[in-house]
Regions:
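A "functional boundary" signal
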Residues: 1-196
Length: 196
């Protein structure tokens, strides 16, 4: 039946996306999009549009990805981690298009949903990166430090290493080479020579 094909298409696309397998063309996820539609709020409809957007994003069609992410947000019936992920991906699209204020807005929306949870570090890091892109180094440092504090509390070593690297870059751009060296050294200790 059509419902089974739509669910299969959605779950297979979701599994590929989660495992970083290229989504290829949109024919598979389009089956789910057509079945679930874009009128009635449901998690499956939101996910179908999200993954359709991810397929577009993978191909470099940012404006189409943005449209699908916005549709997914509209269709999402609950405020949960998945909604935060949609906002986070939408923010990345806006960041790519240099729409920095809108990117920060969406990272903040993701953060508001994730506040107090382990995943809150990701939108904070996004906010910091956008501030750095705008050459607002002090704001970037503030958000990178907030993200680092969360990653340290969660003992997420891969994220801690990445944030040490991020902080080293900001301090280097500020020409504070002593602080930059301190964070590079911490990153190397944690991640080995690959950190540089």
């Amino acid at each position: 039946p059509r419902a089974d094909r739509a669910l299969y298409a959605l779950l297979l696309t979701q599994a590929r996306h989660k495992n970083y397998i290229a989504l290829g063309d949109d024919s598979l996820i389009k089956t789910a999009v057509e079945y679930y539609g874009d009128k009635k709020k449901s998690v499956r409809a939101a996910k179908a549009h999200y993954y359709w957007g991810a397929t577009y994003g993978e191909k470099g069609y940012t404006s189409f990805a943005v449209d699908e992410y916005l549709t997914a947000i509209r269709l999402m019936p609950v405020r949960d981690e998945f909604l935060a992920m949609i906002y986070d991906n939408l923010a990345e699209c806006y960041e790519e298009d240099r729409l920095y204020n809108v990117a920060i807005e969406n990272y903040r929306a993701a953060y508001q949903i994730l506040k107090g949870k382990d995943e809150q570090t990701y939108p904070m890091r996004g906010i910091a990166r956008v501030f750095l892109l705008q050459n607002e180094k002090d704001s970037a440092l503030y958000y990178y430090q907030q993200a680092l504090d969360c990653a340290l509390a969660d003992q997420d070593s891969s994220l801690i290493g990445a944030l040490y690297h991020d902080l080293a870059m900001v301090y280097s751009e500020k020409k504070d080479y002593i602080q930059a060296d301190k964070f590079v050294s911490k990153a190397i200790l944690l991640q080995g020579q690959d950190a540089i």
